[in-house]
Amino acid sequence: MKTISEIKDILRKHKKILKEKYKVKSIAIFGSYARNEQTEKSDIDILVEFYETPDYLKFFELEDYLSDLLGIKVDLVIKGAIKNPYIKKSIEEDLIYV
């Protein structure tokens, strides 16, 4: 199981590709990995902000790319897509930006 530091290092090393190919403006980890509560069965929750909003195909391509890159199932969420104020607040409290 990867640590949060290892995950951040991997994402940092691939920032250029994330920016150029997927138009990623910012990326942050939240959820169990951010709280150091992950288990072997945990996925990793990633909040992403784009320079240009991708179509669905590109969005799921990015999710698959990140899952393959990290070796962990990624649950990708677009910044601004969460409308429920309680969920939004909970996510914001966890955020670890890369």
Curated annotation (Swiss-Prot):
Binds 2 Mg(2+) ions. Transmembrane segments: none annotated. SUPFAM superfamilies: Nucleotidyltransferase. GO terms for molecular function: ATP binding; metal ion binding; nucleotidyltransferase activity. Keywords: ATP-binding, Magnesium, Metal-binding, Nucleotide-binding, Nucleotidyltransferase, Toxin-antitoxin system, Transferase. Its cofactor is Mg(2+). The keyword Cell membrane does not apply. InterPro entries: NT_sf, Polymerase_NTP_transf_dom, Type-VII_TA_antitoxin. It is an enzyme of class 2 (transferase). It catalyses: L-tyrosyl-[protein] + ATP = O-(5'-adenylyl)-L-tyrosyl-[protein] + diphosphate; O-(5'-adenylyl)-L-tyrosyl-[protein] + ATP = O-[5'-(adenylyl-(5'->3')-adenylyl)]-L-tyrosyl-[protein] + diphosphate. Mg(2+) 1 binds at D43, D45, D75. Mg(2+) 2 binds at D43, D45. Belongs to the MntA antitoxin family. Probably forms a complex with cognate toxin MJ0127. Probable antitoxin component of a putative type VII toxin-antitoxin (TA) system. Neutralizes cognate toxic MJ0127 by di-AMPylation. This is Putative protein adenylyltransferase MJ0128.
